[in-house]
Regions:
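Short, structured beta-strand segments at or near domain termini in extracellular proteins/domains
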Residues: 166-177
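Functional-site microenvironments in short loops/helix caps that host divalent-cation chemistry
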Residues: 1-156, 162
Length: 177
């Protein structure tokens, strides 16, 4: 209820659930919103990675699985060292051209949408989709300090989680007025 805006979530049965219809208050971004901002906003062509160019990441492109944590994780980015063993302070690495920080690296992000697999949807265009109305797992987008494989570092990578993880965080969004 920040700034007098209505709550976007309420507790029901020990879980936080979205208010319907979604009000104008602060909320988690939908997977579609996150993907648009991460891959397209301010660009003519979609970005593959949160840094400019191809794999591997350029020096200090973000907080990914690297030499600092190679003794703990199975996959790290070869030859990369961002100087952090875990999460880094927000804004430690350069912002994307549109001004957003840490859309790849540092912590993966919890989305508003519940997780679902959509077979046969690759050739269908959907405008501003949202996931199922209910579920057990939420979509997680973005890489984290534990991400070291080429697929995990792509902005198209999606994961899911039922609860907290040490490399999982969130950002807030709200509808433009």
């Amino acid at each position: 209820q920040k700034e007098g805006r209505p709550e976007a979530y309420r507790e029901a049965g020990g879980r936080m659930v979205a208010v319907s219809p979604m009000p104008t208050g602060y909320r988690l971004p939908t997977e579609a919103e996150w993907s648009y901002v991460a891959r397209m906003l301010g660009r003519q062509d979609p970005s593959r990675y949160p840094w400019t160019g191809s794999y591997p990441p350029t020096s200090l492109a973000g907080n990914f699985a690297d030499a600092q944590i190679a003794d703990t994780l199975a996959h790290v980015v070869p030859g990369y060292d961002d100087k952090y063993r875990g999460s880094a302070p927000v804004g430690r690495f350069a912002a994307q051209p549109d001004g957003f920080y840490d859309l790849g690296g540092n912590v993966a992000e919890w989305m508003h949408d519940y997780y679902a697999v959509y077979p046969g949807m690759a050739d269908r265009l959907v405008s501003d989709p949202s996931g199922p109305d209910s579920g057990d797992h939420h979509v997680v987008r973005g890489s984290s300090w534990r991400s070291g494989s080429i697929s995990e570092l792509r902005l198209s990578y999606r994961d899911y989680s039922r609860g907290p993880r040490p490399d999982l965080g969130f950002r807030i969004a709200r509808y433009a007025e």
